């Protein structure tokens, strides 16, 4: 009897987890948007989001990365007991690792030697996690009608990573042709030289939007499934 009560109460608690995931994701987005107004000196077309740490509002960037990581953690917790396949479980673990990378990025800013480690933990793991989890969720009741959005949003993660790589190579090549050295420990030029095609900043922001959309979509769809048919999300 006690086990039955626990099982019946657990889904409601997980909906609160979904709500928290959504709240922290939205707070992260709000922090990022506000940085564009608080620190307009960082041109969004070619300055990476992490460079806001060199401005006067590093604490807002800290909120951005922290809330992003917490949202990923909450989503991982939400899905851990919900997914059933080994691939899905592996995806949830990778999502938790990705959230850890995002949290570390809050503490290890762009000037810290471990900032690259944070990015390695946070970015590629999210791509694999979203694909593994999404391909499992599309087989579950309540997800079929939205599987197109689910899968497209998952595939958009790796597309956004490829976009960053391409635009980064284009920008670095342009800087080299202009005689400007760009690399670790080198400060970026104050003004973009003529002839340099620099869109990596936009690509960076597209990646963030794509990652956030997936988190929001998964958490919100979980909520909708529970409201429509609570039994579908019970263990």
Label for each model-derived stretch:
Residues 1-14:
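Short, Lys/Arg-rich, polar N-terminal cytosolic tail immediately upstream
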Residues 20-31, 151-173:
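Hydrophobic alpha-helical membrane-insertion segments
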Residues 75-77, 127-146, 157-171, 218-219:
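Alpha-helical transmembrane segments in multipass membrane proteins, preferentially the mid-helix core
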Residues 49-51, 177-201:
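Short, membrane-exposed interhelical loops at transmembrane-helix boundaries
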Residues 10-13, 78-90, 138-152, 224-230:
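Membrane-interface helix-boundary motifs at transmembrane edges
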Residues 51-70:
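Interfacial helix-start motif at the membrane-water boundary
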Residues 25-43:
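Alpha-helical transmembrane segments of multi-pass membrane proteins
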Residues 100-149:
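Membrane-proximal helix-loop-helix units in multi-pass membrane proteins
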């Amino acid at each position: 009897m006690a086990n039955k009560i626990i099982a019946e109460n657990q889904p409601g608690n997980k909906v609160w987890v979904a709500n928290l995931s959504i709240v922290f994701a939205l707070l992260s987005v709000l922090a990022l948007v506000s940085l564009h107004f608080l620190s307009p000196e960082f041109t969004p077309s070619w300055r990476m989001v992490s460079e806001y740490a060199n401005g006067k509002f590093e604490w807002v960037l800290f909120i951005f990365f922290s809330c992003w990581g917490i949202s990923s953690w909450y989503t991982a917790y939400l899905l851990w007991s919900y997914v059933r396949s080994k691939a899905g479980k592996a995806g949830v673990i990778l999502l938790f690792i990705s959230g850890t990378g995002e949290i570390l990025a809050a503490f290890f800013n762009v000037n810290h030697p471990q900032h690259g480690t944070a990015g390695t933990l946070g970015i590629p793991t999210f791509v694999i996690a979203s694909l593994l989890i999404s391909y499992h969720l599309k087989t579950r009741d309540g997800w079929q009608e939205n599987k197109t959005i689910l899968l497209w949003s998952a595939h958009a993660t790796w597309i956004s990573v490829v976009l960053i790589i391409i635009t980064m190579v284009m920008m670095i090549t342009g800087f080299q042709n202009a005689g400007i050295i760009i690399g670790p420990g080198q400060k970026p030029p104050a003004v973009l030289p003529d002839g340099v095609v620099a869109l990596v900043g936009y690509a960076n922001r597209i990646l963030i939007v794509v990652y956030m959309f997936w988190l929001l979509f998964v958490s919100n769809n979980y909520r909708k499934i529970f409201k429509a048919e609570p039994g579908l999300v019970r263990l």
